[in-house]
Amino acid sequence: MSFWKKSRYFAVFLTAACAMQFCAGCSVPFLEKQESDGSGYLFTASLPANPKSLDPQSATDAASKTIIENLYEGLVELDENGSPQLAAAESYTTSADGLVYTFLLKNDRYWFYDANQDDVVDDDETWKVTASDYAYAFQRIFDPQTQSPYTTMFSCLQNADAVQSGQLDPSEIGVRAVSDTELQFTLSRPDAEFLSNLASTAAMPCNENFFQQTKGRYGLDKESVASCGAFYLRLWFYDQYGNQNQIFMRRNAVNAKARSVYPTNLTFQIRKSSDEAAADFTDGTSDLMTSSVYQPQYMESDNYSVTATRSVTLGLIFNPDDTAFANAKIRKALSMGIDRANIGGNSSGDLLPAYGLIPPAIHWNGTSYRDTYPDAQTAYDPDAALTLFQQGMQELGRESLDSAKILVCASLMDCDNLHDVIQTWQEVFGFYIGIEEVSESDYWDRLQSKNYTVAVCGITASYDSPAGVLEQFSSRTNPFYYANGTTDAASRHCTSAVRKRNSSKMRPAGTIPSG
């Protein structure tokens, strides 16, 4: 969800709960018109962490993507309904078989690199964005040396597997610049999500000459970033021991008129946690706030502008090294032992039951995925759950579970209904599991070190697609060290099997969706 007071905005992620999953969401419309159009304004926001990289073909963290979206412009962008709209592209056509996409680029899009840092556009500091810049970006995605996390997203491209495995040169990927203003994509199979995926940060252009000049530093510091979007990077200062860290961006004059850019400057205070970022909004330091937790002081006030979407699913995750909770029957029994109908009753409407991993805010073919594929209901069946639980205990040769606690971070998620889940488990299975609340930094440290038994974790998409949710469970990238070859294979074939993957993800995996 997002909120503004007068010129201040607050974003909040609402949640939906299910087998142990909850949904939430947020948007950060810096250029959205409120009481005025924002012309000439300086907007300030706070990031909960320092961006890891401003390389669009590699960055995955939210802080990095926030900056990248203001630095670069792609061929298309998504509107408020998740439908792709033309951005840097003037037009496009699709072949009858859905395998060839041809884009014509606009002639008024430019790169800008303020080499002498005088905030003036000199002739030698700007050059046109061309089709080759987009082609090179996709070559980088599939170049094995890049190790880009976005190969699955664009696995439909011709020669994707062969290039990624090193059998073919990256230049053989199915993207070519026909001319400076004409770009052609060739797919090996139709992909209904391809056009929407072109709105992701991964599909932003990359100028090969500039990339080579950075000598391996591309996107890692201010001197290694060129802008082709609404703003350019003026300052990126970060000292892990300091508290004056910030990113300062100025309006990109060469693109401002064509893109109708309203603010003159954007300032991002770099904080160490979501709590610190929230405190900036409370004391008036920042104009915008995003949150995955219901904030009544903003939500229930007429003084703030609020935007909310259900884009996060909360789920229970289990330590893969824990013998008891690694047992599939015990995990399934716990899922069946959750009365999801009662989830969200006391949550002020921000928490709803969730029966699958993909939240309502995710789109598929321009509509909500859940409108097309509703959640498969997981029935509350305490008798069957107890029977399955006892079978699991017999397989383990145990009579009871060891004492354990569920790891939670209150600043990241709404866990009020967790007490109801625990009480139901005690009634059904005869054991009690506690709650351990930790700080945001400790929470992530504990997950990464696998120092937990059970934890509540928020699952959201890295991009607006069902595949963007399921890819969070990749054995290579997920934060809770869950590994499953079947899930990885399903994620690689997300376009043709997305509905099946959603079901298989929810049940055999070490995750129980709840709200």
Regions found by a protein language model. Give the residues of each.
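Structural transition elements
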Residues: 351-392, 413-415
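Gly/Pro-rich hinge or "lid" segments in bacterial periplasmic/extracellular proteins
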Residues: 170-172, 176, 180-181, 186-265, ...
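Ligand/substrate-recognition segments at binding pockets and active sites
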Residues: 242-244, 391-461
